[in-house]
Amino acid sequence: MKMIFEAPATVWQEAFPLGNGRIGALMFGDGEAETLCLNEDTLWSGYPGDPRTGMGYEDIKKAEVYAKEGSYLQATQVLNQAQETAEDVEMYEPFGTVRIWFEGEREIADYHRELDLETATARVTYRNHGQSYEHRCFCSAPSQVLVYQIRAEEAFTIVITADGGFLTGNSWDGKIWKMQGQMPGKSKIPVEAKEGDGSEFIFSENPQEKGMPYEGWCMFETENGEIVPTEMGVRCVNVHEITMRILIRSGFAGVSRHPYTQGNDPAKLLLQDQEQTGISVEELWKEHVGEYQKLSLIHISEPTRL
């Protein structure tokens, strides 16, 4: 079964979701640009500490008394007032957003995008000035890698950047584009925070108050052309095909371990992941599909049309 659309997705709510249980992505675009919103299941702000803020046992008991009396409004008010001082000291956070921009004037026609539910693969096809393009994306659990490809009948140039989340910088070592990030140490944003109330994330220079480090690596394979590093990312010039293999790791080492002083080194974990992605892209895809289809325990069918 496939989800098929004949129009681009312009916002993330219309994106195709992809993931492998640890790495997640939302893929959307319009033929002139593509966006990959990325996350990873261990990316949290904060660090181990006293989890009790705001609402306490006494507040709950007081609300219980009101509720038993049928005074539900008063019970709700008690809980809401207690929540006003509660802090979200540990919040699930995104990795960031990778953006792919096509250079030059584009004239898009015959746009088609689909999410194949039987292979967990997203595909986009269209024509630019009459020349065929195909985008493909999947997220492998066996190899722990997100693969994104563009193939075309003509040479094209794209600019790739990363922003959002808590990314702090990027670098190019001649082979790998590396994205680095640092989670906040604590969030001073109350549960009942209102927009513009001055609350903010806390970034401390004290190692004991630092948040979790994280990193993403992107390895490129191209047909023709060249890859040129830029201040914000990379530029792939006059290529006919490009494959991006994206790896993500955080410093998470357990819920009771400090993510900065006792955490893992993301770079070491990425080196281990890199060793698993040495096979060809088609082998990665077949491996991904084989593992994914082991979970095919149900069948979805369309209702009978009258």
Residue ranges and their predicted role:
Residues 1-301, 305:
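Acidic/polar, glycine-enriched structural segments that form the non-catalytic walls/loops
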